[in-house]
Regions:
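N-terminal glycine/serine-rich phosphate-binding loop of ATP-dependent small-molecule kinases
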Residues: 1-97, 125, 231-240, 428-432, ...
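Active-site core segments that coordinate phosphate-bearing ligands/cofactors
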Residues: 6-8, 22, 108, 114-178, ...
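Active-site donor-binding loop signature of nucleotide-sugar glycosyltransferases
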Residues: 32-34, 218, 294, 474
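Short beta-strand-loop/turn "lid" adjacent to the catalytic site in phosphate-handling enzymes
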Residues: 64-101, 130-136, 169-192, 217-218, ...
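Carbohydrate-associated surface elements
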Residues: 104
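A conserved helix-loop-beta module that forms one wall/lid of the active-site cleft
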Residues: 206-221
Length: 503
């Protein structure tokens, strides 16, 4: 009898549920978008109740459309947008404020004060991160300091804090389980990646009561079961929740990057390059960060990571704000209609620059416009910008890693773009390997849950499931690529520190 694993893939713009069989094949899926809330420039929020409602609806629909007996679902795994932060009432399960999203830059002044206080080295030594508004710690502090009554309620033990994994597990278990996994915890700026515990000194420095925080747990073990009487999920009551990982380490796991030195890039709302660095964390000297990749069977694997904030979101900007395209695939068609971007460079620093620059005050820039620039050139420049940013990350990674990268595995929505993948291979001078199963993030969560319940017996078995769909090899002249990349770096300089004096 076939056995299935359900993965909840809670992303920045939509909530998805995917059902996998033992061969790693997709049996059913469902997806629902939710609102993006922008209260002020540089601020990004989500409604936590919309996150829960859309994820619950997606799970129910995926199971229903599969036409299977829900009792054949062995486990549920969760993967999620990381760093996005929620505070909620422990008794009612109601959020006290909207979720503050990973892209939100409202806490940049808090980060500046922490850096001025000399906390930077301590943060890096203990957490593997840099002080930046990207991470959850300053988001929790902002909520405590700015939402009336929240600090007092937190100190009385009435509230819970967590990233989206914690929120979903809490809701799925009917408020019985308040946990997070090591990979999500390691993105808070509060978690010691050496001891795998919340760091008391860092919590004190940020004024965060430790009783707010969820219990950190390994990535592949039982956390709880789906509660009875959840509207729409009654048939799933009792199914164990056994796997959890942030979206990027889940993709690294789903890509079967189990050997140190293997790396992947996910082309989603942002771009995220992760390399497996093995059992010991690597301290970056090139503007990258180190996080927990996963902890399975008592063994913790660390990942070196570079993150850029705007990739697929730049294509959405072309569609939704500029109206230059009607659908995302039109960006490819436009870009393919011209041989290059015509000297146009776009730096999509809409919410600052991530790795390796870490500039909270950078803003988006378009340079090189002339009267002959067309919307096709703009579309090509958008795809180029995504590839340039990943090139920045891989170059930094090669500076830090014990040995240079030899192949980049890719996934995420924009990885279906042949023109983008070819541009990426040209700029990196490396093979770019696109898998047959592009839903690697969701499969990573399913794999972690399936390992915990015996659906898959080993990581070697999971590795055999990964197949390549296409490998892109460098084709363009190397010297021309080098000139293009140098121009990109010039454009980046023009975007730096753009609004520093305005905050």
């Amino acid at each position: 009898m076939e056995t299935y694993v359900a993965a909840l893939d809670q992303g920045t713009t939509s909530s998805r549920a995917i059902l996998f069989n033992r061969a790693g094949e997709i049996v059913a899926r469902a997806q629902y978008p939710f609102r993006q809330i922008y209260p002020q420039p540089g601020w990004v929020e989500h409604d936590p109740m919309e996150i829960w409602a859309t994820e619950k609806r997606a799970l129910a629909e995926a199971v229903d459309s599969a036409h299977i007996d829900p009792k054949r679902i062995a486990a549920v795994g969760i993967t999620n947008q990381r760093e996005t932060t929620i505070l909620w009432d422990r008794a009612t399960g109601q959020p006290v404020y909207n979720a503050i999203v990973w892209q939100c830059r409202r806490t940049a002044p808090i980060c500046d004060r922490l850096a001025a206080d000399g906390l930077g080295e301590t943060v890096t030594d203990k957490t593997g991160l840099l002080i930046d508004a990207y991470f959850s710690g300053t988001k929790i502090k902002w909520l405590l300091d700015n939402v009336p009554g929240v600090r007092e309620r937190a100190e009385r033990g009435e509230l819970c804090a967590g990233t989206v994994d914690s929120w979903l597990i809490w809701q799925l278990t009917g408020g019985c389980v308040h946990v997070t996994d090591y990979s999500n915890a390691s993105r808070t700026m509060l978690f010691n990646i050496h001891t795998l515990q919340w760091d008391e000194d860092l919590c004190h420095a940020l004024g965060i009561p430790m009783q707010l925080l969820p219990e950190p747990r390994p990535n592949s073990e039982p956390y709880g079961v789906i509660a009875e009487n959840i509207p729409g999920l009654e048939a799933l009551a009792g199914i164990p929740i056994c796997g959890s990982a942030g979206d990027q380490p889940a993709a690294l796991f789903g890509q079967a990057c189990f050997t140190p030195g293997q790396a992947k890039n996910t082309y989603g709302t942002g771009c995220f390059t992760l390399m497996n660095v093995g059992a010991e964390p690597v301290r970056s000297k090139a503007g990258l960060v180190t996080s927990v990749g996963w902890s399975v069977n008592g063994r913790t694997t660390y990942a070196l990571e570079g993150s850029v904030f705007n990739a697929g979101s730049t294509i959405q900007w072309l569609r939704d704000e500029l109206g230059l395209i009607g659908t995302a695939p039109e960006c490819d068609r436009l870009a393919e209609s011209v041989p290059d971007a015509g000297g146009v460079y776009i730096v999509p620093a809409f919410t600052g620059l991530g790795a390796p620059y870490w500039d909270m005050y950078a803003r988006g820039t378009i340079v090189g416009l002339t009267r002959v620039t067309t919307k096709a050139h703009i579309a090509r420049a958008v795809l180029d910008a995504i590839a340039f940013q990943v090139t920045d990350l891989v170059r930094a990674m090669n500076d830090d890693a014990p040995c240079p990268l030899t192949t980049l595995r890719v996934d995420g929505g924009a990885s279906v773009s042949d023109i983008l993948m070819q541009t990426q291979a040209d700029l990196l001078r490396l093979p770019v390997d696109r898998p047959a199963q592009v839903e690697t993030t969701a499969f990573g969560a399913a794999a972690l849950a399936g390992l915990a319940t015996g659906v898959w017996g080993s990581m070697e078995e999971l590795e055999r499931l990964r197949l390549s769909q296409h490998v892109f090899l460098p084709r363009r002249d190397e010297a021309a690529c080098a000139v293009d990349y140098a121009q990109w770096r010039r454009a980046v300089k023009r975007s730096r520190s753009w609004i520093e004096n305005e905050l």
